[in-house]
Amino acid sequence: MTQVLVRNGIQAVGDGLTSLIIVGKKSVLKNVTFEGKFKEVAQKFVTDGDSWNSMISRIPASGRHPLHYELAHLITVPDASSRGNTPTNAHSIYKELKPINYPEDTKNVHFVLFAEYPDVLSHVAAIARTFCKFSMKTSGIRELNVNIDVVCDKLTNEDAVFLTDLSESVRETARLIDTPANILTTDALVDEAVKVGNATGSKITVIRGEELLKAGFGGIYHVGKAGPTPPAFVVLSHEVPGSTEHIALVGKGVVYDTGGLQIKTKTGMPNMKRDMGGAAGMLEAYSALVKHGFSQTLHACLCIVENNVSPIANKPDDIIKMLSGKTVEINNTDAEGRLILADGVFYAKETLKATTIFDMATLTGAQAWLSGRLHGAAMTNDEQLENEIIKAGKASGDLVAPMLFAPDLFFGDLKSSIADMKNSNLGKMDGPPSAVAGLFIGAHIGFGEGLRWLHLDIAAPAEVGDRGTGYGPALFSTLLGKYTSVPMLKQ
């Protein structure tokens, strides 16, 4: 299994064939001198300082430049960016790295990352997510030793340890997303959560199967009751006495979404194994934060189901009662994510007494029309929180764009004549579909009245091509990092 290790400064690598990847913005690279440890690792591919200086002066401001029969590469990261992009331009690193085919006998991939302090986290995360963990090819998974040596005066050893853990969290998120539902069943995802809970010394609560119905979790139970393995609600709690903040990370964990009785098409159903990307990202964000001295109370709440077809599955026209006590007329069995998240956020508010609630989900296909394939779409009742998560998105590379929060204008789109609300609007609506879906969740906690609530739809940025991106841990580590002991997260 490939391991990714982040180190403070340039260091030696292990024995065997090594591929060298030099990464940095051109404005930073032009100040790099060909001497010392950099010369030691680069001189196999760049003959001398004059050659280095000549190359840096002539290469384009962005792109990948193969060196020495493609055993080494120089990646220049654009300095300029638009207002809606991240100034770190982290996506360009992923774009340039992903096509590289390392020579068959490569043992080590040695990254030398020259970066300014604010850019380091997003650049490391972009590099890490190119090394996918899941594969069932009979040829096996290549085992590489990946070292990311960061050259940055302000970087501390504690930063480097955190970045190693963050890299693992990003890659674990992607692994969970890439794992098919015949392997990552609801039971298996519960086991993954329990493993994280044990590793972080967390309090673990698991409510499963018929226990959900008895406890009133109507959304989670009724969506998941038709699945081959039982639905579950898992809470990991990092409780700090005297906390002034009680934060809940709520994730949608639909291990497979057939659409239910209103079944998806033959082209719409493939890749629905990824519908647990919100739960995966929140689980691994929780792990990264708690491992590094999170000083406030933090909970991860995972709503885990398989939305399948059976004689007992939810039917259009069914009315179910939610944990909030509200009733919902189901008119769309493929609008299941909002049903399970509504139970999750209500539990976070009423049982965990959370002062801030985040929910994250691969919720709506319409999200890509609202904010594109690279930006998650955020809706919140708190303008300051909206600004904070957009800023964190730019710093982390997990980009975020705002969507409208206007329950007084748009919640009427879910009006029902026989229940408190419908779970979707199948006709013309006043609100954007992704925002209306988010408002359904918020309706069960009074649209965040008395607390801060943010809903994040990541249907598009959770994936790229055939792979998960690991979206989430970098974003929430940056957003909530001020409560950790990591210097780079406190800037």
From Swiss-Prot:
GO CC term (a single one) = cytoplasm
CDD domains per the record? Peptidase_M17 (cd00433)
Substrates-to-products reaction catalysed: Release of an N-terminal amino acid, Xaa-|-Yaa-, in which Xaa is preferably Leu, but may be other amino acids including Pro although not Arg or Lys, and Yaa may be Pro. Amino acid amides and methyl esters are also readily hydrolyzed, but rates on arylamides are exceedingly low
Q: Gene3D superfamilies from the xrefs?
A: Zn peptidases, Zn-dependent exopeptidases
Q: Which positions are annotated as binding Zn(2+) 2?
A: K252, D257, D275, E336
Q: Which cysteines are joined by disulfide bonds?
A: none
Q: Which GO terms describe its molecular function?
A: identical protein binding; manganese ion binding; metalloaminopeptidase activity; peptidase activity
List residues binding Zn(2+) 1.
Answer: D257, D334, E336
- What Pfam family is a match for this entry? Pdase_M17_N2
Q: Which SUPFAM superfamilies match?
A: Zn-dependent exopeptidases
The organism's superkingdom is given as Eukaryota
- Alphabetized UniProt keyword annotations: Aminopeptidase, Hydrolase, Metal-binding, Protease, Zinc
Tissue expression remark: Expressed in the buccal cavity, pharynx, anterior gut and rectum.
The entry's active site is: K264, R338
Q: Which cofactor does it need?
A: Zn(2+)
The note on cofactor binding and number reads: Binds 2 Zn(2+) ions per subunit.
Q: Which GO terms describe its biological process?
A: proteolysis; regulation of egg-laying behavior; regulation of growth rate
Its Enzyme Commission number?
3.4.11.1
Briefly state the protein's biological role.
Answer: Probably acts as a digestive enzyme.
Query: So what family is this one in?
Result: Belongs to the peptidase M17 family.
Q: What is this protein called?
A: Leucine aminopeptidase 1
Q: Which gene encodes it?
A: lap-1
